Amino acid sequence: MILIIYAHPYPRHSHANKRMLDQVKVLDGVEIRSLYELYPDFNIDIAAEQEAISRADLIVWQHPMQWYSTPALLKLWIDKVFSHGWAYGHNGHALKGKSVLWAVTTGGGEAHFDIGSHPGFEVLAQPLQATALYCGLQWLPPFAMHCTFVCDDETLQAQARHYKQRLLDWQETHNG
């Protein structure tokens, strides 16, 4: 099962993320949890989230880039849900054998994320990748949709279809 942890602070105002979700919500074996709709007060039900993760083979962190990072609620979700003794540490093996995909949208172009002489997007992924690897998750190459503020609808739809295909390809590889 694919579990999409969707973290858009203003989901009704989304253009790119909405199209991405519209493409994948019709797939078999996909569950979408919209954090800002579930937890507008930031009071995360840790047990419910851990139960959802336990059913998943692939976890997708889908969100818009905000100041070169994740939205606040996704960061809090990781901090709370990936708890010691469950996700890492002594007896913390709940995530081992699962995969994670970072699916992010940006308003700027890919070159906008170059930081000095460093390839910015790879640098920006490092905290999430380090968290994933520390918890025993397999880190998959990220999916990024850039320039979403200036893309026309046709381009956004094409990118959303590409996202859907990434998930279909993963399902085909892992479900035989």
Swiss-Prot record:
A GO MF annotation of the entry reads: electron transfer activity
Its EC number(s): 1.6.5.2
Q: What are the names of the required cofactors?
A: FMN
| Record keyword Glycoprotein present | no
Query: Where in or outside the cell is it found?
Result: Cell inner membrane
Family annotation (Pfam families): Flavodoxin_2
Where the protein is mainly located, per its record? membrane
Give the record's keywords alphabetically.
Answer: Cell inner membrane, Cell membrane, Flavoprotein, FMN, Membrane, NAD, Oxidoreductase
Taken from the UniProt record, the cysteine pairs bridged by disulfide bonds within this chain are: none
Catalytic activity, reaction form: a quinone + NADH + H(+) = a quinol + NAD(+); a quinone + NADPH + H(+) = a quinol + NADP(+)
> Mind telling me which InterPro entries this protein's record contains?
Flavodoxin_fold, Flavoprotein-like_sf, K_H_efflux_KefF, KefG/KefF
Q: Describe the function of this protein.
A: Regulatory subunit of a potassium efflux system that confers protection against electrophiles. Required for full activity of KefC. Shows redox enzymatic activity, but this enzymatic activity is not required for activation of KefC.
- Protein name, UniProt field: Glutathione-regulated potassium-efflux system ancillary protein KefF
Tell me which species this is from.
Enterobacter sp. (strain 638)
Q: Which gene encodes it?
A: kefF
